[in-house]
Design a protein with these regions (language model features):
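Charged, alpha-helix-forming regions
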Residues: 1-444
Length: 444
């Protein structure tokens, strides 16, 4: 018995799928222009940040970022089915990250100046859910990465982006592919929601333990003493060093850690590692296990990495190494603090967000930290490390299952969107495997 997708492919595109370049299908437009820092302090219109575009395949519309737009001012508004792209990043692999406006909105929404938009001449020809998955697929990302130029900072060339080719099957096929792929992301979302609940529990205990004004902490946890806590600016107990400037390569004798290597949980990304060849100058930037690195710009600003091992590694120029006075504060204690609400409330106020976020030493040095005695810090670290392991150990439990689901989704997505000479047989194979999986789930 044929699946619905198989029937649609056989009926509507038996000879394959047509490809078109982006310049054949639509036009690019820019983000906000002519704006000063003051325009972003109090505004009368909402705008989409760089981070919103970078982080979300489908644009998040519940935003609070505002900008002042004059009555007769000419700026580009975002429309339904538009595709937004990040314009620059530290690495080519993070350039041109896409986000699709998949919902209708009556609000005028503007785009930050570090991103740009693309609008189809005939948007009715496209299914927005299909586009959401397509522009994050391996096939499209492989093309988009090649549009980035630069050495230490990479920028997307719109002239090259215009030559990117996309498959345009009939809309009925797009709809079915979009539904199929959304089913996989929904399964992952359910698991992620469960993990998020656990992470909230960890976050609650972390913020609870770091609130030394709460006498309840001492009463319930005898090893936590709130009576002798200092509140110290980070700049008074830390030394800051900016990273090394070099071009990240696929091969080399030393890992080159970049801002994009810091995951949301403060861990080092094991994937997409880049390298350099060590020389006398770069030796000054070698890392040791337990070192702290701060992302100072871009979508990862403010995130802090606790270097997990003694792998030979150098840190890049968009990172800041934080060297703490360990007679006052433990590195691991600071790392847990750097994920707390107390830290992020300060970081979000101190960061410069007029364009791409900037969180440099003059800002981070003003972050105030509660510093109890070292013995108390050690007890807090022991408690929080146990919670952290439950939430972030990729070898077992929910994190491992979520990772497996993500890989499964990526396989199905890239297979369904390949549209090569064997596209139909690929799609049929994938759909039948999906049907068998649903049968097994119903039987279990």
């Amino acid at each position: 018995m044929m699946t619905k997708l198989e029937e649609l492919v056989n009926e509507l595109c038996p000879d394959g799928v047509e490809y078109f370049t982006l310049e054949e299908l639509g036009t690019f437009y820019g983000g906000l222009t002519g704006k000063s820092k003051k325009d972003f302090e109090k505004g009368n219109a909402k705008f989409i940040t760089y981070m919103n575009v970078y982080s979300n395949p489908a644009l998040k519309l519940d935003v609070s970022d505002v900008v002042t737009i004059g009555e007769n001012e000419k700026q580009n508004c975002i429309q339904y089915a538009d595709i937004l792209f990040t314009g620059s990043s530290e690495t080519p692999n993070d350039c041109g990250m896409s986000s699709v406006l998949t919902e209708y909105t009556d609000e005028n929404l503007y785009l930050n100046s570090f991103s740009f938009g693309y609008r189809f001449n005939n948007p009715d020809k496209f299914d927005v859910i299909y586009l959401k998955h397509l522009f994050r697929s391996h096939m499209l990302r492989k093309q988009i990465v090649k549009t980035a130029n630069g050495v230490t900072r990479f920028n997307v060339s719109k002239a090259k982006m215009a030559k990117v080719q996309i498959p345009v099957p009939p809309k009925e096929v797009q709809n079915e592919i979009g539904k199929t792929l959304d089913n996989f992301t929904e399964l992952t979302a359910e698991l992620t929601a469960e993990l998020t609940a656990r992470q909230k529990q960890y976050a609650f205990y972390r913020d609870y333990l770091l609130d030394f004004s709460n006498e309840d902490v001492t009463k319930k946890i005898p090893d936590i003493d709130c009576s002798n806590v200092e509140y110290i600016k980070l700049g008074d107990i830390a030394k800051f060093t900016y990273g090394y400037t070099d071009k990240a390569k696929d091969y080399g004798d030393t890992r080159f850690i970049r801002i994009t290597d810091i995951l949301d949980n403060g861990y080092l990304n094991p994937n997409d590692a880049k390298y350099i060849n060590l020389n006398e100058e770069s030796k000054k930037y070698l890392l040791s296990k337990g070192d702290l690195l701060l992302a100072r710009t871009g979508a990862t600003y403010g995130k802090t990495l606790f270097v997990p091992n003694d792998e030979k590694a150098v840190y890049a120029s968009f990172l800041i190494k934080i060297e703490l006075d360990n007679t006052k504060i433990l590195n691991r204690y600071y790392w847990h603090f750097s994920k707390s609400n107390l830290y992020w409330k300060q970081a979000n106020k101190l960061v410069s967000t007029a364009g791409q976020p900037q969180f440099n030493t003059n800002a981070v040095s003003r972050v105030v930290i509660p510093v109890p005695p070292l013995s108390v810090q050690e007890n807090i670290v022991k408690i929080l490390d146990r919670f952290d392991k439950l939430n972030n150990d990729m070898s077992e439990g929910l994190p491992a299952e979520i990772e497996a689901r993500k890989k499964q989704y990526e396989y199905y997505r890239d297979t369904l969107l390949s549209f090569d000479d064997k596209a139909c047989s690929h799609i049929v194979k994938v759909e039948r495997e999906r049907e068998r999986e649903r049968e097994r789930e119903r039987e279990s």
